[in-house]
Regions:
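Catalytic beta-strand-to-alpha-helix segment of the class III nucleotidyl cyclase homology domain
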Residues: 265, 284-386
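Ligand-binding pocket scaffold of soluble enzyme catalytic domains
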Residues: 1-220
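Hydrophobic alpha-helical membrane-association signature
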Residues: 24, 209, 256-260, 296, ...
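Short linear capping/connector segments at secondary-structure termini
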Residues: 126-130, 145, 278-283, 316, ...
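Conserved beta-strand segments of alpha/beta enzyme cores
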Residues: 187-188, 274, 363
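Catalytic NTP-binding/metal-coordinating core of nucleotidyl cyclase/transferase enzymes
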Residues: 219-298, 302-303
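Conserved beta-strand termini and adjacent loop/short-helix elements that scaffold enzyme active sites
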Residues: 191-193, 278, 350, 367
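Long, domain-scale regions corresponding to catalytic signaling modules most often appended to membrane systems
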Residues: 222-223, 385-387
């Protein structure tokens, strides 16, 4: 068994800025590498379930199974996700944490809200106040709360192929059901008697969770080699390439394209991108994290500008099929269509990419709703702005 404290919690160092899901996913992989664990069953609770879902979809070859307790797919309220915290509640909570963290009256109120069944237990209240005061400074508490609220993996749930067990309290029935409905073959078990946040501290209730986990894990057989993976797809295209080639002639254009390709490949290597194809003057590549893909797109754009070239870039995160070392599936043409909709010098991304880098500090400008040729539905697109 491997236990580790997420950034900003427990014995891990305080966070200077809110880590993204992608950064925290890298932490999971680093811990597994350090422990020489090639594959593992991931057990995560509450907002940590979003991290586990993203890891399982991105690294299916390293995930034997998932066990999620009171899972959440999104931290903030949305019309189709009414169980999450509203913007108003979130802002009020951030203000209270910033202004009142460490205050006994505030922490007592918070303890009674989180664990109403223990509201009159003076020993529990004393412990909770002691625990919260020593767990984080006000600034660290704000960062941790922001980390818990930001991030949205609703579009990733269907990409999880690992056997999945969801354990939940009765109060979380609908939210857990939402997650279970979107993970193929997921098993849902309601644990009666778990009324609030700190019920898990009850040894009897905790034993129930452990028993259900053991029963599920013992029944997980050999996991086949995955043929699908969550990836961020990148497409680039040189703006005005035909006119430029005609203006400078074929020999000069070939030399310029060679320098362009070298520049792109250098940035792909720097940001752990995988080159999948080149078509004329464009590149098709994949990444295991959307934040790295955006950073790489910006770097490519600046690098080729030194050659007097302007590009457009499109990014989309989705489930892909592995085909003889290549990636296929609807996510690939979707990424290509996003790139086609980008303006000169623009890094255009789908809403899925934007949701997955929440908390990164990356700024986006809304580019409206688009129909992408050959792709069902309409798509909200955003330009990633390099500050």
């Amino acid at each position: 068994m491997i236990l580790f404290d997420k950034r900003g919690s427990g014995l891990s160092d305080p966070v200077r800025q809110v880590p993204t899901l992608e950064t925290r996913m890298d932490d999971v992989r680093a811990v597994m590498d350090a422990a020489r664990s090639e594959r593992a069953v991931l057990w995560a609770g509450h907002e940590g379930s979003r991290l586990a879902v993203l890891f399982a979809a991105t690294y299916p070859e390293r995930t034997n199974a998932l066990v999620l307790y009171d899972p959440t797919a999104r931290g903030l309220w949305a019309p189709d996700y009414p169980w999450a915290t509203t913007d108003e509640e979130w802002l009020r909570e951030l203000r209270d944490i910033r202004e009142r963290w460490g205050d006994r009256d505030y922490l007592t109120e918070r303890a009674r809200w989180m664990s109403p069944s223990l509201a009159e237990d003076d020993a529990f209240i004393d412990w909770f106040v002691w625990y919260m005061r020593r767990s984080a400074s006000p600034a660290e508490a704000v960062s941790f709360y922001r980390m818990a609220m930001e991030g949205d993996v609703r579009e990733v749930l269907s990409a999880v192929r690992a056997p999945t067990l969801l354990l939940h309290r009765p109060a979380k029935r609908e939210e857990a059901g939402y997650v279970a409905d979107r993970i193929a073959g997921a098993r849902l078990i309601e644990i009666g008697g778990l009324r609030d946040w700190f019920s898990w501290a009850d040894p009897q209730r905790n034993a129930i969770l452990l028993r259900e986990t053991e029963r599920f894990v013992s029944g997980v057989g050999a996991v086949p080699e995955p043929d699908r993976v969550l990836a961020t797809i990148l497409f680039t295209d040189i703006v005005g390439s035909t006119e430029r080639a005609a203006a400078i002639g074929d020999p000069a254009w070939r030399g310029l394209i060679e320098r362009h390709h070298a520049a792109v490949r250098g940035e792909l290597a720097r940001f752990r991108g995988v080159e999948l194809d080149t078509s004329g003057d464009g590149f098709f590549a994949s990444f295991d994290g959307p934040g790295r893909a955006i950073a790489c797109a910006w770097a490519i754009r600046e690098s080729v500008r030194t050659l007097g070239l302007e590009i457009r870039v499109g990014l989309h995160t989705g489930e892909c099929e592995r085909l003889d070392g290549k990636l296929g599936g609807i996510a690939v043409p979707t990424g290509a269509r996003v790139a086609a909709a980008a303006g000169p010098g623009e890094v255009l991304v789908s809403s899925t990419v934007k949701d997955l880098v929440a908390g990164s500090g990356i700024e986006f400008e809304d580019r409206g709703v688009h129909g992408l040729k050959g792709i069902p539905g309409t798509w909200q697109l955003y330009a990633a702005i390099d500050a």
